[in-house]
Amino acid sequence: MDEKFNDATKQRPQGERIMDATLVTIDLRSFTKQIREEKSWQDSDRNAITVFKTDGMRIVLIALHKNAEMAKHTADGMISVQVLEGQILFTTQEQTIELNSGQMLALHKGVPHSVLAKEETIFLLTLTTTLAGKNPGSK
């Protein structure tokens, strides 16, 4: 498998971070420190960095300031949300779940949901994505 790297951006001009390979190690402490030091964390109510991306799956580290809200939306694939630090309220039409550090949830695709940070929070979002050129359920 060929290694794939991120492209440099205005926010992250260094680029060249491995995004996909046969084996990718992810230093969550280092990425958490990085997103807390970036200008967008100072200027906004959130910041995020994609730490792994391949056909079929994406992993994103997300930081939210206290009271930051991700308005109601849906995901095109199944997701998991794992709180590393802090506390969020995760709301669907049926229920609201309080997730604290060390807790996680899984949610099927297409379910409308929102996220509210009750305190400064860092969480890991893992989502399944459609395989390029494949129909769902095909082998």
Language-model segments: residues:
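Structural motif
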Residues: 58, 87-89, 96, 112, ...
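Short beta-strand His + acidic residue motifs that chelate non-heme Fe in jelly-roll/DSBH
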Residues: 70-72, 90-91, 107, 112-118
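Short acidic-glycine-tyrosine-enriched beta hairpin
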Residues: 93-109
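A cytosolic small-molecule/anion-sensing beta-strand core signal
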Residues: 55, 84-85, 100-101, 119
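A short, N-terminal "cap"/entry segment at the start of jelly-roll beta-barrel domains
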Residues: 1-56, 91
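Glycine- and acidic-residue-biased ligand/ion/polar-headgroup-sensing regions
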Residues: 76-88, 93
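Conserved short histidine dyad/triad with adjacent acidic residue
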Residues: 44-45, 55-75
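Ligand-binding loop in jelly-roll beta-barrel domains
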Residues: 109-133
